[in-house]
Amino acid sequence: MLSPKRTKYRKHHRGRMRGKASRGNTVVFGDYALQSLEASWITSRQIEAARRAMTRQVRRGGQIWIRLFPDKPVTMRPAETRMGSGKGAPEFWVAVVRPGKVLYELKGVPESVARVALRLAASKLPVKTQILVK
């Protein structure tokens, strides 16, 4: 699973997801891409599950690029803990995704295979997506 090797701060604010993606919203590396249509947090587990689903479909021929990275820690408190005594410990990592962000790119396979692979990956993610062709 993806996570940063080291960070400047251990805990982040939750923040808000306003507006559209101004960067990372075009197909750069591959011929086909999966683009987000909604704003959401995508966990490192979801990123990995989608990658595995795509890899299984594409086999050896294709090349896959993951265009997002989970760099935001999400903290959680232990179950049945009283209020107070500070913020919880970091539990998992998320990537903040805004509408328009390209999530995955694919190259080296026929369009039919690419569409099936990207649709499988999309089913593992918590956002509505569309498939782009370069």
From Swiss-Prot:
Gene Ontology molecular function terms on file: rRNA binding; structural constituent of ribosome
**Highest taxon of the source?**
Eukaryota
Q: Where is this region: Disordered?
A: 1-21
Q: Show the Gene3D superfamilies listed in the entry.
A: Ribosomal protein L10e/L16
- Keyword annotations of the record: Chloroplast, Plastid, Ribonucleoprotein, Ribosomal protein
Subcellular location(s): the record lists: Plastid, Chloroplast
Cited CDD domains: Ribosomal_L16_L10e
Any one cellular-component term (Gene Ontology):
chloroplast
Pfam families per UniProt: Ribosomal_L16 (PF00252)
Q: What is its main location?
A: plastid
Please list the GO biological process terms of this entry. Answer: mitochondrial translation
Regions crossing the membrane: none
State the family named in the UniProt similarity comment for this chain: Belongs to the universal ribosomal protein uL16 family.
Its subunit composition reads: Part of the 50S ribosomal subunit.
What is the designated name of this protein?
Large ribosomal subunit protein uL16c
